[in-house]
A protein has these predicted regions:
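Compositionally biased terminal segments of proteins
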Residues: 1-197
Length: 197
């Protein structure tokens, strides 16, 4: 493994992605690492990625990760939980990676919209702007709302508003209201209009 100290969760993620690739599991990096790709810099001690895998295949992936030397913990959500399962990887330096599976409302087409960014000489897949913003609005915590607004402000081009509206609808009425509020307060002119219909 590449990690040599704490604060290197991104390197732990790089190692884990090798296992994902060999198991033919698609992924999209989210969370603070994705925020940095979308123009928001903030400290993080972990790394997060969504996996395109069902929860039963997740157990086989966990065995592969264990065989490769990763320490894992698999937690399953109940019916009221917006996340079906989380597979957490840790190393001896307390670096951690959360692999998320089955987020309620998440569009599986997001895996085909990922953007590739090089890290440590490897090409990694990050969630696209519209998916990032919709997920942050769905999470709904104050920092998530700040991240959604900041990502839109930092974007070099306006988002695909039609897609963003559709993604918000997938997450439910509260996410739609959050998007409407964000856009009504948005200081920059966004193409395609602001009204959700």
């Amino acid at each position: 493994m590449r990690t040599k100290a704490g604060g290197e969760s991104a390197l732990l993620l790089l190692d884990a992605i090798q296992i994902l690739r060999s198991a033919d599991v698609d992924y999209a990096i989210v969370g603070a690492l994705a925020a940095s790709v979308h123009g928001l810099i903030r400290a993080t001690s972990d790394a997060d990625a969504l996996l395109s895998i069902n929860t039963s295949a997740l157990m086989a992936l966990e065995r592969s990760l264990n065989a490769a030397g990763f320490k894992t913990e698999l937690r399953r959500g109940d019916v009221s939980d917006p996340i079906s399962a989380v597979l957490t990887l840790r190393d001896e330096f307390k670096n951690s990676v959360d692999f998320l599976v089955g987020i309620r409302g998440f569009d599986p087409k997001a895996f085909s919209r990922t953007i590739e960014v090089a890290l440590d000489g490897e090409s990694l897949k990050f969630v696209a702007l519209e998916d990032f913003v919709a997920m942050k609005l769905f999470a709904g915590r104050p920092q998530d709302l700040v991240d959604a607004k900041g990502a839109l402000e930092a974007a070099p081009e306006p988002p695909n508003m039609e897609l963003l509206k559709e993604l918000a609808k997938r997450y439910g009425a509260e996410t739609v209201r959050s998007l409407e509020s964000l856009l009504s307060n948005f200081s920059r002119d966004i193409d395609s209009g602001l009204e959700l219909g």
